[in-house]
């Protein structure tokens, strides 16, 4: 049972970091765009990801874990990719150029990385059904956010 919980906690830790990357990325993007409607959507997605973090951390605690800045070795590569896209190299360049389309493009890329992280989590054997339900719902919400960002980008 302990090994199963360790696996659950490791998956949750990876997803917490993914959601935190998304939250930070959307906050940065929202602060950089001028269009009020686009800014509002990006702020909404930042809040959504903050909610994901809370839900995932709460779930980790239910399984006896803590999500204090921990990722697995498997998750490290996905987190590095997510961090690069979600924020911190490409998004900074787009923000510096004050190019809303480029900023939204980086948000799309960050969500693609998040979707991959969630898909990876869903492929983990032996996760409890209730956790799979949470992961699937959050993944669907990320997919919907990505589609919204794509639509916003196309209207600019």
What residues fall within each predicted segment?
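Alpha-helical bundle segments that constitute or directly flank the non-heme di-iron/ferroxidase center
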Residues: 2-34, 101-126
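Alpha-helical scaffold segments that form or flank carboxylate-/histidine-based iron centers
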Residues: 7-15, 36-55, 76, 100-106, ...
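Amphipathic alpha-helices that form helix-helix packing interfaces
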Residues: 15, 22, 29, 52, ...
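Secondary-structure edge/capping motif, primarily at the C-terminal ends of alpha-helices
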Residues: 26-33, 60-63, 67, 95-98, ...
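Outer-membrane beta-barrel domain signature
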Residues: 42, 50-51, 55-57, 62, ...
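Carboxylate-rich helix-loop segments that flank metal/cofactor sites and access channels
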Residues: 54, 58-109, 113-115
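Preference for long, well-ordered alpha-helical segments
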Residues: 103-156
């Amino acid at each position: 049972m302990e090994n199963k919980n360790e696996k659950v906690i490791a998956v949750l830790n990876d997803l917490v970091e993914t959601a935190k990357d998304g939250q930070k990325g959307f906050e940065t993007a929202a602060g950089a765009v001028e269009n009020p409607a686009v800014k509002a959507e990006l702020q909404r997605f930042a809040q959504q990801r903050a909610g994901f973090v809370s839900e995932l951390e709460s779930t980790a605690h239910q399984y006896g874990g803590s999500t204090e800045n921990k990722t697995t070795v498997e998750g490290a590569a996905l987190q590095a990719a997510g961090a690069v896209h979600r924020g911190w190299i490409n998004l900074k360049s787009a923000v510096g150029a004050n190019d809303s389309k480029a900023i939204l493009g980086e948000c799309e890329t960050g969500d693609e990385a998040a979707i991959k992280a969630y898909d990876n989590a869903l492929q983990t054997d032996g996760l409890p059904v209730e956790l799979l339900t949470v992961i699937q719902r959050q993944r669907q919400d990320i997919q919907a956010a990505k589609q919204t960002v794509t639509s916003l980008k196309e209207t600019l």
